[in-house]
């Protein structure tokens, strides 16, 4: 069993939430949202029933807090620690042990905060304070009136949040909030994998997977460096496990890997959906540092735009 120098501790601990300023706390589920937690705790009705939408909308005039306690260890010499939020919706402040470590303003990205020297041995308290999205867009609209969809709420164009939440000609006004993706504590002594991009080239009887792997140095997770493009001791290997259990491995920082006689993925109703498991393992001077695993389907997509009596078969 490989031991990686990058440790990823999921904060799937017991969370609680409440309306900011309210003494009553409720059990929360993370990942989740304010609406799903209020529904689960009997604090709101189904927003899609009758005119409950309007009462659900009023709830988002308020601020909400989420809190959890987790067991941590202090960073050792040479280690860096980061809190990673894979999805926060949307305007919020982050506190670790009552110290503000950052704020967010965009639900369409991942957020990471350096907490080296801030994580204690033993119990740590993590708190996320969500500001009302309705108050945010109201203030932004008053400063700069800008319109979007006629059926959406004024000011929605000023916030980096799923715009469908603010209403559409077909949609309800339900601007939810919350920690909608996982939270992790990262501890590392070296860099870690930042991204893996896989391209597929299909030929008769085979598929070639082409890899682009980038890493983050431990000092700055915002910086991306292609693995294998610098003489810094970083390499990676790729392992692909076929649906039948066959394993293909390519070492020494491969740019591509060939799968012979592939099992192709087809849309529902057209064929089967076999998945291949791809694992990229990064090492520094031969020591495993980090790994990345995903399941992918081998497929291509083209648009049928042959001429027809109206122009082309695909409307675009």
Model region roles, listed by residue range:
Residues 1-316:
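Secreted/periplasmic carbohydrate-active enzymes, especially glycoside hydrolases
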């Amino acid at each position: 069993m490989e031991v990686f120098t990058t440790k990823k501790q999921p904060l799937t601990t017991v969370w609680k939430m409440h309306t900011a300023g309210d003494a009553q706390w409720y059990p929360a589920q993370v990942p989740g949202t304010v609406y799903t937690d209020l529904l689960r705790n009997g604090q709101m009705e189904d927003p899609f029933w009758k005119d409950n939408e309007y009462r659900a909308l009023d709830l988002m005039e308020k601020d909400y807090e989420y809190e959890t306690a987790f067991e941590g260890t202090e960073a050792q010499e040479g280690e860096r620690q980061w809190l990673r939020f894979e999805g926060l919706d949307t305007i919020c402040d982050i506190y670790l042990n009552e110290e503000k470590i950052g704020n967010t303003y965009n639900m369409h990205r991942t957020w990471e905060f350096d907490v080296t020297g801030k994580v204690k041995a033993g119990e740590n308290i993590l708190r996320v304070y969500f500001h009302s999205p309705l108050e945010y867009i109201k203030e932004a609209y008053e400063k700069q009136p800008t319109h979007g969809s006629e059926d959406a709420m004024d000011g929605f164009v000023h916030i980096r949040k799923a715009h469908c939440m603010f209403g559409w000609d077909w949609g309800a006004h339900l601007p939810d909030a919350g920690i909608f993706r996982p939270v992790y504590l990262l501890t590392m002594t070296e860099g870690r994998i930042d991204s893996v991009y896989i391209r597929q080239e299909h030929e008769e009887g085979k598929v070639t997977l082409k890899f682009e792997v980038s890493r983050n140095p431990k000092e700055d997770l915002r910086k991306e460096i292609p693995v294998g493009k610098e003489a810094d001791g970083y390499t990676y290997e790729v392992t692909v496990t076929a649906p039948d259990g066959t394993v293909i491995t390519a070492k020494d920082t491969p740019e591509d890997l060939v799968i012979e006689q592939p099992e192709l993925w087809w849309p529902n109703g057209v064929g089967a959906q076999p998945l291949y498991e791809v694992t990229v393992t990064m090492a520094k001077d031969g020591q495993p540092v980090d790994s990345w695993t995903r399941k992918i389907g081998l497929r291509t997509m083209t648009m049928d735009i042959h001429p027809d009596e109206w122009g082309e078969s695909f409307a675009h």
